[in-house]
């Protein structure tokens, strides 16, 4: 059986490799020169693997190392921020290894940690930290097809093993292999390899929590659509004005492109016509849409194939091989017991040799089951996850296109509204000018007011004379006798008694005010008391919105072009890697079958030779 970390089906060779032989150690801490990584051949048993955990050298490696030291490693201009950055920058082809997976000693064994070895540095990370790394890379590079990580525990896992689901050794070994594949896939992507967040994940002196809560991860907007696609951590002020489309938004169907959208089933191959737009052609976004739609359709078909028939066949095959191995193990023990009970000098050894062949076939079948699972079944499940990643990247590009259309539509609406408001304002000014000119021609008469004034004075004088005559008939008996003529205010006692009744009126209307006050306020809010001022304020706000949308339109157009170019570039890279991977998987499948058949054939040929020695007499 291979070591867990050796079950990496994505290496550059199908031969088994030692988990530690690919690590590099500096020749001296002062020079910081590194040996060129050259994966050696790995023995076929675990016991042999345990003796090869050091750095393996051969003559060719020494010669290449001398050449490397003469030329010197590629150094970064401006220096390095940390040791791990230097290792990753100067050794871009260095494999990242996960050497161990087990319970954390620091946490008292509450969770599983994975030991990552990069050169001569080691760091321990949890599965949740791997998930946060991938999430950060996805947000920092929304146009890149970031490799997936193994899935979390499903409800079926907890139902089957409710107490020890997280400590299931098979799941831990699977994650150990696939997380190493994830790290090495990311390492081969230049945009990620040069990202500071990426190499800080391998820095034992860096706090991963602080990395996630600092720039650039913390500077990414809550909605990735309000950020530039190539630099989401540094959005411009104009990005704040971009509208956010719904997650289910789709592109508008343009007449004349339907025939392109339905050309999904295209020939396979890196140079197949129609998979990608031709080189050297400057196509518009609407002309690029059919290529993206066709690629998404082909990826969806591949996902259905991998998660449907292929997954079922792989599960049945591995199950049958495991059952066959168990039967061969039992058969070997039966033959061995039978050989002990047989007293014939030639028959006993032959039966024993049959039992040994069955035992060795059991071991070979177990190895076949493990190698097929690691080199074929697991990669197929990973590619099914890749299909979902590709769809999400293409969906991001679609949402950027929809965002551009929404910005253009909103800008057109605001401009139409501004034209309407300006026309209304011009009409209102025309009417106002007409009314003001009419008032200057015919001023209103003022004679009627002057005619009404004398009667009021006469009434006031007459009322005063009547009051004085009444007071003379009824002289006062109290007060100051020196004053025989009381004032007019003293002759009106009834009016003073009517004041309290008037003071009670507001208290009687307070209930009405409480009931109808909010209604009156709402009606006044609906019925504009100053339509001219409201119209002018609305014109100002509309002009401001138009200015913001014009800025948003410029950045949206730029974002769509950058997103389409970056997505298309990474799609080509992914397509090439996918075809290389599928070719490697098929060869690995055939190689595993060949090795199993050779071992089985050799054991049973030796058993047949022993059986032919049986004395027939």
UniProtKB/Swiss-Prot annotation:
<feature type="domain" description="PX">
    <location>
        <begin position="89"/>
        <end position="209"/>
    </location>
</feature>
<feature type="compositionally biased region" description="Basic and acidic residues">
    <location>
        <begin position="454"/>
        <end position="463"/>
    </location>
</feature>
<dbReference type="InterPro" id="IPR036871">
    <property type="entry name" value="PX_dom_sf"/>
</dbReference>
<keyword id="KW-0472">Membrane</keyword>
<feature type="binding site">
    <location>
        <position position="175"/>
    </location>
    <ligand>
        <name>a 1,2-diacyl-sn-glycero-3-phospho-(1D-myo-inositol-3-phosphate)</name>
    </ligand>
</feature>
<dbReference type="GO" id="GO:0006914">
    <property type="term" value="P:autophagy"/>
</dbReference>
<dbReference type="GO" id="GO:0042147">
    <property type="term" value="P:retrograde transport, endosome to Golgi"/>
</dbReference>
<keyword id="KW-0813">Transport</keyword>
<feature type="compositionally biased region" description="Low complexity">
    <location>
        <begin position="20"/>
        <end position="31"/>
    </location>
</feature>
<dbReference type="GO" id="GO:0015031">
    <property type="term" value="P:protein transport"/>
</dbReference>
<dbReference type="Pfam" id="PF00787">
    <property type="entry name" value="PX"/>
</dbReference>
<feature type="compositionally biased region" description="Acidic residues">
    <location>
        <begin position="59"/>
        <end position="68"/>
    </location>
</feature>
<feature type="binding site">
    <location>
        <position position="126"/>
    </location>
    <ligand>
        <name>a 1,2-diacyl-sn-glycero-3-phospho-(1D-myo-inositol-3-phosphate)</name>
    </ligand>
</feature>
<feature type="region of interest" description="Disordered">
    <location>
        <begin position="1"/>
        <end position="83"/>
    </location>
</feature>
<feature type="binding site">
    <location>
        <position position="128"/>
    </location>
    <ligand>
        <name>a 1,2-diacyl-sn-glycero-3-phospho-(1D-myo-inositol-3-phosphate)</name>
    </ligand>
</feature>
<comment type="subunit">
    <text>Forms a complex with SNX4/ATG24 and ATG17.</text>
</comment>
<protein>
    <recommendedName>
        <fullName>Autophagy-related protein 20</fullName>
    </recommendedName>
</protein>
<feature type="region of interest" description="Disordered">
    <location>
        <begin position="434"/>
        <end position="516"/>
    </location>
</feature>
<feature type="compositionally biased region" description="Basic and acidic residues">
    <location>
        <begin position="48"/>
        <end position="58"/>
    </location>
</feature>
<keyword id="KW-0175">Coiled coil</keyword>
<dbReference type="GO" id="GO:0010008">
    <property type="term" value="C:endosome membrane"/>
</dbReference>
<feature type="compositionally biased region" description="Polar residues">
    <location>
        <begin position="480"/>
        <end position="500"/>
    </location>
</feature>
<feature type="binding site">
    <location>
        <position position="152"/>
    </location>
    <ligand>
        <name>a 1,2-diacyl-sn-glycero-3-phospho-(1D-myo-inositol-3-phosphate)</name>
    </ligand>
</feature>
<dbReference type="InterPro" id="IPR051079">
    <property type="entry name" value="Sorting_Nexin_Autophagy"/>
</dbReference>
<comment type="function">
    <text>Required for cytoplasm to vacuole transport (Cvt), pexophagy and mitophagy. Also involved in endoplasmic reticulum-specific autophagic process and is essential for the survival of cells subjected to severe ER stress. Functions in protein retrieval from the endocytic pathway. Required for proper sorting of the v-SNARE protein SNC1. Autophagy is required for proper vegetative growth, asexual/sexual reproduction, and full virulence. Autophagy is particularly involved in the biosynthesis of deoxynivalenol (DON), an important virulence determinant.</text>
</comment>
<feature type="coiled-coil region">
    <location>
        <begin position="403"/>
        <end position="440"/>
    </location>
</feature>
<dbReference type="GO" id="GO:0035091">
    <property type="term" value="F:phosphatidylinositol binding"/>
</dbReference>
<dbReference type="InterPro" id="IPR001683">
    <property type="entry name" value="PX_dom"/>
</dbReference>
<keyword id="KW-0072">Autophagy</keyword>
<dbReference type="InterPro" id="IPR044106">
    <property type="entry name" value="PX_Snx41/Atg20"/>
</dbReference>
<keyword id="KW-0653">Protein transport</keyword>
<comment type="similarity">
    <text>Belongs to the sorting nexin family.</text>
</comment>
<dbReference type="InterPro" id="IPR027267">
    <property type="entry name" value="AH/BAR_dom_sf"/>
</dbReference>
<dbReference type="GO" id="GO:0005829">
    <property type="term" value="C:cytosol"/>
</dbReference>
<keyword id="KW-0967">Endosome</keyword>
<keyword id="KW-0446">Lipid-binding</keyword>
<dbReference type="GO" id="GO:0034045">
    <property type="term" value="C:phagophore assembly site membrane"/>
</dbReference>
């Amino acid at each position: 059986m291979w070591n867990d970390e050796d079950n990496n089906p994505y290496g550059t060779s199908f031969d088994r490799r030692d988990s530690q032989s690919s690590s590099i150690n500096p020749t001296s801490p002062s020079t910081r020169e590194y040996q060129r990584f050259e994966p050696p051949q790995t023995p076929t048993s675990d016991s042999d693997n345990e003796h090869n955990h050091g750095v393996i050298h051969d003559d060719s490696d020494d010669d290449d190392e001398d050449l490397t030291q003469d030329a010197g490693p590629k150094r970064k201009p401006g220096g390095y921020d940390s040791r791990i950055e230097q290792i990753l920058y100067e050794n871009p082809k260095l494999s990242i290894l996960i050497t161990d997976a087990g319970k954390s000693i620091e946490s008292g064994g509450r969770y599983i940690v994975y030991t990552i070895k990069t050169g001569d540095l080691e760091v321990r990370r949890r599965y949740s930290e791997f998930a946060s790394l991938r999430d950060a890379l996805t947000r920092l590079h929304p146009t890149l097809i970031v490799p997936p990580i193994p899935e979390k525990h499903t409800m079926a896992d907890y139902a089957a093993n409710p107490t020890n689901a997280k400590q299931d050794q098979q799941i831990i070994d699977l994650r150990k292999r696939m997380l190493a594949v994830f790290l090495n896939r990311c390492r081969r992507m230049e945009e990620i390899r040069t990202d500071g967040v990426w190499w800080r994940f391998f820095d034992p002196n860096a706090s991963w929590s602080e990395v996630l809560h600092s720039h650039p991860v913390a500077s990414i907007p809550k909605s990735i659509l309000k950020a530039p696609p190539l630099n989401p951590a540094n959005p411009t002020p104009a990005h704040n004005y971009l509208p956010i489309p719904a997650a289910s938004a789709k592109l508008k169907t343009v007449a004349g492109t339907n025939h392109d959208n339905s050309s999904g089933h295209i020939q396979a191959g890196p140079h197949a016509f129609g998979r990608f737009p031709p080189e050297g052609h400057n196509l518009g976004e609407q002309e690029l849409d059919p290529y993206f739609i066709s690629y998404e359709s082909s990826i969806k078909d591949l996902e259905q194939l991998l998660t449907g028939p292929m997954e079922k066949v792989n599960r049945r095959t591995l199950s049958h091989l495991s059952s066959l191995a168990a039967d061969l193990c039992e058969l070997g023990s039966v033959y061995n017991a039978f050989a002990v009970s047989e007293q014939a000098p030639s028959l006993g050894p032959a039966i024993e040799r049959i039992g040994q062949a069955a035992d060795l076939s059991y071991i070979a079948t177990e190895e076949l089951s493990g190698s097929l699972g690691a080199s074929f079944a697991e990669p197929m499940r990973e590619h099914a996850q890749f299909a979902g990643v590709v769809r999400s990247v293409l969906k991001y590009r679609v949402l950027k296109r929809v965002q551009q259309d929404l910005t253009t539509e909103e800008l057109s609406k605001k401009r139409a509204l501004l034209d309407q408001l300006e026309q209304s304002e011009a009409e209102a000014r025309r009417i106002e000018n007409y009314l003001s000119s009419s008032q200057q021609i015919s001023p209103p008469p003022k004679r009627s007011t002057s005619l009404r004034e004398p009667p009021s004075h006469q009434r006031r004088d007459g009322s005063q004379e009547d009051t004085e005559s009444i007071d003379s008939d009824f002289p006062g008996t109290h007060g100051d006798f020196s004053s025989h003529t009381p004032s007019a205010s003293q002759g009106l006692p009834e009016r003073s008694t009517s004041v309290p009744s008037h003071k009670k009126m507001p208290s009687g209307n307070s209930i009405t005010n409480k009931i109808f006050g909010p209604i009156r306020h709402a009606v006044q809010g609906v019925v504009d008391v100053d339509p001219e001022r409201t119209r002018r304020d609305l014109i100002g706000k509309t002009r401001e919105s138009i200015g913001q949308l014009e800025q948003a339109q410029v950045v949206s157009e730029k974002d769509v072009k950058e997103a389409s170019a970056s997505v298309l570039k990474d799609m080509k890279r992914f397509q090439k890697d996918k075809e290389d991977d599928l070719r490697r998987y098929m060869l690995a499948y055939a190689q595993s079958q060949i090795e199993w058949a050779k071992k089985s054939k050799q054991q049973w040929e030796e058993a047949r030779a022993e059986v032919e020695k049986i004395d027939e007499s």
